[in-house]
């Protein structure tokens, strides 16, 4: 393990050793949340319909999230170039967490669909932001390996999502399908705030 936690690379500052492991872990958590919420609601949908009604709009609980995350991804990439990847990534986490909390508090199917879209807007930033930050903090020769690990998050989330969703519905409430994001997201925020130090662009370009 290198005695020096930092070395110049790319547009940011490459990390090594414990510093890299800590930051990478936080980025993995962010990606995991974004991927998890694509599938975690699937086993909760029958219970949600039984509580909120709105059977005809059921598919939009998933679709609104996916559409919002896909549509917002290019915008986050540009905002990261303009204002720095760290503040934009933090904003994405906060949007995602607000959307998660509001989704759990929903009192109608319409509210849930709208708040899932808000969640998706945050998720788009988590996905693109994590990959962009990795490109900044991981030395170039190791970048492919770390990107591969990030990619495996989606495989894990696709299996864990329905299982965790089913467990939470049975053990507590369908609302905890969304509340479960809060402690994980807060941990990721704290690590990024205090351990990730990136160069913020001095020159800002128009969108």
Residue map of PLM features:
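Transmembrane-helix bundle of Major Facilitator Superfamily
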Residues: 2-200
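Short, intrinsically disordered, charge-balanced linker/junction segments flanking boundaries
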Residues: 203-207
């Amino acid at each position: 393990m290198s005695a020096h936690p930092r070395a110049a690379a790319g547009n940011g500052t490459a990390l090594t050793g414990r510093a890299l492991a800590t930051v990478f872990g936080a980025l993995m958590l962010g990606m995991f949340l974004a991927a998890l919420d694509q599938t975690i609601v699937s086993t909760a949908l029958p219970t949600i319909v039984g509580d909120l009604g709105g059977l005809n709009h059921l598919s939009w609980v998933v679709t609104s999230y996916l559409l919002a995350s896909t549509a917002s991804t290019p915008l986050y990439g540009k905002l990261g170039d303009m204002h720095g990847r760290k503040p934009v990534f933090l904003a994405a986490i906060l949007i995602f967490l607000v959307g998660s909390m509001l989704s759990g508090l929903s009192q109608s199917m319409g509210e849930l669909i709208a708040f899932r879209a808000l969640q998706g807007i945050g998720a788009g930033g988590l996905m693109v932001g994590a990959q962009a930050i990795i490109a900044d903090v991981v030395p170039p020769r190791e970048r492919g390996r770390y990107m591969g690990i990030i990619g495996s998050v989606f495989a894990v989330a696709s299996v864990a999502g329905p299982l965790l969703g089913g467990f939470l519905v049975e053990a507590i409430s369908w609302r905890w399908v969304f509340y479960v994001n809060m402690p994980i997201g807060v941990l990721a925020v704290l690590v990024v705030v205090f351990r990730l130090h990136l160069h913020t662009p001095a020159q800002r370009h128009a969108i």
